[in-house]
Structure formats: structure tokens, C-alpha cells
Amino acid sequence: MSLISRLRAVVAGDDYLDGDLDDLVYDDDQPEQDQRASQADGGALATIGDGNPFDLGDNFSGSNVIGMPGISTAAAEVNLMEPRSFDEMPRAIQALRERKTVILNLTMMEPDQAQRAVDFVAGGTFAIDGHQERVGESIFLFAPSCVTVTNTSHDEASTPTVVSRDAEAEQQQEAAAAPSPAWGATAL
């Protein structure tokens, strides 16, 4: 039987469904005694060879799916951190790698160290395709990619827009604007 006719038979299902497999050559180098001994020692694989090769029976009722580390069906965990120095930032990155949400309250840090900490954790968040959000003054939320962050705050949309150009209106607009963080106050 040629290769093309075998392929046609496989596609059509003729020879294999009828049990016409006699023209295939098998090697019977191993004696029958050794086959029985290997089946007795082979465990689950020995029971498969006894019957229909496509019937796995009850031996493989379990699943072969292996879960991802860090993902569980338990409740999600949020870490609230109030670091006092930059040396505590690797803990935030480790929590993100373990698929935990991190809230950083940086009010206890010096402004330059706080900026460095935000940049460091934001880089780690970007590396794992996570999300970052500024929650408040010196408070930031960093979430892994498995967490969806939505912002339903309408504070930004409700800020009035000043149309006039007189100096008094500009001063009122600057006073009403959100204050900049202490670490970002640099003269341009």
C-alpha cells in the first residue's frame, strides 16, 4: 500500500475503521514473557495496552491542566504600603509579581525619594503589563494585568473652564487647579 493510498484511507476512514491493519509490519523482538513483566511493572501505561488504545478508562479521570502560580480562586489580595524609604520598594514589586494589588501611600517619604519610588514601581508595573492609577495626593494604586482598574471619578470633568483672559480670572483658575505633588515642584 503506497503512502498516498494510506493517506486517502485515513482521510476516508476506510481501512482503519474496518480493522484492515494487517499489512503494517511490527517488530516482535521482545519475547512474550518480557511483555507481561513490563505490563505488570508499567502501572497505568500497562492497562492502556490491554484494550482499545483510544479508551483511557478510569485511570486518567484527572486533569492534566497545571494552574498558573499566583492565580487562585480565593479573594484577591491588596497590599497597603506606607514606606519610609526607597529600600522598601522591592517588596511592592514582589507583591505585583505575586499578582497582588499594591497601594502606595508615599506621604511619609521625602519628595525626591517618593518620586524615585513611584518611577521604580511604575517601571515594574509596566514590565508585567499592569495598571497604575493616582488615587490621591501622594497615594498610588498599582495593579497586575489580571486586575481591571476603572475610574468613575467625575472630579476632573466638573472643573469649570474660564473663558475670560483678565488677570483676576487667571489667578482664580490657578488657585482652583489641583496642587502639584511636592516632588514634582521644579522650576521650568
UniProtKB/Swiss-Prot annotation:
Keywords: Cell cycle, Cell division, Cytoplasm, Septation. Cell division protein that is part of the divisome complex and is recruited early to the Z-ring. Probably stimulates Z-ring formation, perhaps through the cross-linking of FtsZ protofilaments. Its function overlaps with FtsA. This is Cell division protein SepF. Residues 152-188 are annotated as: Disordered. Pfam families: SepF. HAMAP family: SepF (MF_01197). Residues 152-162 have a biased composition (Polar residues). One of its GO terms (biological process) is FtsZ-dependent cytokinesis. Belongs to the SepF family. The gene is sepF. GO terms for cellular component: cytoplasm. It comes from the Bacteria. The lineage of its organism: Bacteria, Bacillati, Cyanobacteriota, Cyanophyceae, Synechococcales. It is found in: Cytoplasm. Homodimer. Interacts with FtsZ. It comes from Parasynechococcus marenigrum (strain WH8102). The keyword Cell cycle applies.
